Amino acid sequence: MLSGLIQRFEEEKMKHNQERVEELSLVRVDDAISQPPRYAPSAPMPSSMPTVALEILDKAMSNTTGATQTQKAEKAAFASYAEAFRDDVRLRQIKRHVNEQILPKLKSDLGGLKKKRAIIHMTLLIAAVVALLTSVCTLSSDMSVAFKLNGTSAEIPQWFKSLNPMLGVVNVGATFLMMVCAKSERSLNQQIDMIKKEVMKKQSYNDAVRMSFTEFSSVPLDGFELPLT
C-alpha cells in the first residue's frame, strides 16, 4: 500500500511538472507587448527651399531702399533667386523657357528706347542752344548794345532789331521744345529702368535654375535635401 501511494505521488508530480512546462511555453498576449520593427526612414526630407527663399528675401530687404539703379537691380536679382527657390520644379522649368523667349524681345525694346532717348536728348541740346542764342540776340537788341570794331563804335543795325519779334517766337518755341523733350526723356528713362529691371530679374531667375548641385551642396534646386558624402 505504501509503494502504491509513492507511485501515485510520483505520477502526480510528473503530471504537474509537465503542465507547468506547457504553461511556461505559451506566450500570453497581455504579457508580451509586440512592437513593429524599426526601419530606417526612407521618405524624402522636408524641403528647405522655403527657408532659403526667406533668407534671400531677408537679405534683399535688410538694406535700405535702393537709391541707385545698381542697388535696385541687386534687390531685383535677390527677389528672382528667392522666387526660383520657392517655385516648384515644373513651374521653374516653364518660367525658364518663357524667360528665354521673352529676353530677346525685351533687349530689342531696350535698344530701341535707348536710340529714341539719344535722339530726344540731342534735340533737347539743339533746342537749348537755339533758345540761348535767341535770348542773347533779343536782349542785345533791346538794350541797344554797341560793339567796338577797330576803335570805332558799331551799333546793332536797325534791320536786325526788326527781327526781335521773330526771334522771340523762336525762343518761345525752342523753350517749349526743351520742356517737351525733357519730359519725354524722363519718361523714357523710367521705361528703360523698368525694362532693365525685368531683364535682370529674368536673367537672375534663369541663372538660379541653371545652377549645379555642387554649388549648393546640401541645398539643391530640385526641392529636397541631398545626403552629403
UniProtKB/Swiss-Prot annotation:
It is found in: Host cell membrane; Host Golgi apparatus. It holds the Pfam family Orbi_NS3. One of its GO terms (biological process) is symbiont-mediated suppression of host innate immune response. Plays a role in the inhibition of host innate immune response. Interacts with host OPTN and thus inhibits the recruitment of TBK1 to the host Golgi apparatus. In turn, downstream partner IRF3 cannot be activated and IFN-beta production is impaired. It is a multi-pass membrane protein. This is Non-structural protein P8. The keyword Membrane applies. InterPro entries: Orbi_NS3. The keyword Membrane applies. Keywords: Host cell membrane, Host Golgi apparatus, Host membrane, Host-virus interaction, Inhibition of host innate immune response by virus, Membrane, Transmembrane, Transmembrane helix, Viral immunoevasion.
